[in-house]
Amino acid sequence: MSEKKEIKNKINCISNTKKITKAMEMVSIAKMKKSEIKMKSRKPYLDIIKTIISHILYNHIKYRHLYLNNRKTKKIGIIVISTDRGLCGSLNISLFKKIIQLINIYKNKNVMSSLFILGSKGVSYFKSSTYDITYYEKIITKNYTFFDCLNFIHSSLEYYNTQKIDKLFLSYNQFKNTLVYIPVIMQLLPLSKKIFKGNKNSHWDYIYESNSGILLDTLLNDYIESQIYQSILENCTCEQASRMISMKQATDNSEDLIKKLRILYNKARQDNITQELTEIISGANAVSLY
């Protein structure tokens, strides 16, 4: 009887867990769709800025900006886009391992690294080791807007602008589809003029008033800020997709476990019935002997 009760309690406990994981799966689906729409809606804006910069640079070949100038690398900075919450599979760990590889590559060249981390998971991971965390922030709002992340972006860029670091990398999870997301590390600064090539031959009839150099300064800043924010949106979409899959797997595993426990419960129940029948028959036989 105690075995049946124990199995029944396990079934009830797992059923309650299954309800939670199923609810979290549905919430993640809704959040992922919302985040994906936001991510895709920002992409054309980034492409347009890139196109405008391409045309201006094409007409100002000798123009040099702080973000276009290469300098001797003494120290690098890495912007780490992580999550505030867990239960999203190996999303963070895969990215962190790639970041550590980059740090070690530059360490072998006697180049130190500074980390600018967004998300509490990244902070807790790198704080447990001896890595230099220069600046960090948590994602404090559910709907993380462009203006919410400006303080983090400006704090990171300030170190490059004041030449405290000579290269700035951006690390995040790139969203491909619901099942595929890739940990990516890209060099954010200095920018290569190669990334702005490809659009210069298209039709263009804008007139810049008055100084295109001033406009280019503004656009380059806007491009960098938008690039970082785009990576934040992609990482958020990856987070929800990964959590959705993790919760679906947990729900499916719960269902499988419940099925196995029900088989055990029915078997224990049948054993009890068989034992009771055996006892009744044995008792009846004993009475008939008298």
Curated annotation (Swiss-Prot):
Database matches in Pfam families: ATP-synt
**Membrane association type:** Peripheral membrane protein
Q: Does the keyword Amino-acid biosynthesis apply?
A: no
Subcellular location(s): the record lists:
Cell membrane
Keyword Transport found: yes
- Assigned keywords, A-Z: ATP synthesis, Cell membrane, CF(1), Hydrogen ion transport, Ion transport, Membrane, Transport
As for family, the record states: Belongs to the ATPase gamma chain family.
* Protein name listed in UniProt: ATP synthase gamma chain
**Natural source organism:** Buchnera aphidicola subsp. Schlechtendalia chinensis
Gene name in the database record: atpG
